[in-house]
């Protein structure tokens, strides 16, 4: 799950498909928009709540919305969300530094860029780098930078 369509756009879909991984950005989902209005929360927070209902393993890729990162941490701490990992690199001044520090200090498996810097492009690059270094034999060399001899 990504917090922005921009992050999702930068992720290698062919590789995700090859791995059998589904990918979603719920920020424009009508259910998310309605929930955000009803609860008076950000759409990013509502998207995390909706994603929590997915029983499959999840990785959250957050490059823009510190509120999404805060919601992930809160829900994990309250045993309302299970996530395999989080890439937490929201950019900005408001809550970005604090949310990333909180993720860093949590027990959630994560890649975090501490401080103000980050962004959707970095989030996409990080998940792509993780995928590029996965089992190349399973993926086939046409999807990776490496070729096993």
Where do the model's predicted regions map?
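Short, well-ordered, mixed-charge alpha-helical segments that flank or form enzyme active sites
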Residues: 8-10, 32-34, 68-71, 93-96, ...
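Structural signal for hydrophobic packing residues in well-ordered secondary-structure cores
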Residues: 8, 27, 55, 76, ...
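Glycine-rich, small/polar surface segments that engage phosphate groups of diverse ligands
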Residues: 2-46
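Buried hydrophobic positions in well-ordered alpha/beta secondary-structure cores of metabolic enzymes
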Residues: 3, 87-88, 126
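Short, acidic/small-residue loops that bind anionic groups at enzyme active sites
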Residues: 22-30, 81-97, 108-115
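Short, solvent-exposed amphipathic alpha-helical segments in soluble enzyme
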Residues: 14-19, 74-81, 101-105, 127-131
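Long, charge-patterned amphipathic alpha-helical coiled-coil/hairpin "stalk" segments used as oligomerization
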Residues: 42-99
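C-terminal functional extensions of proteins
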Residues: 94-149
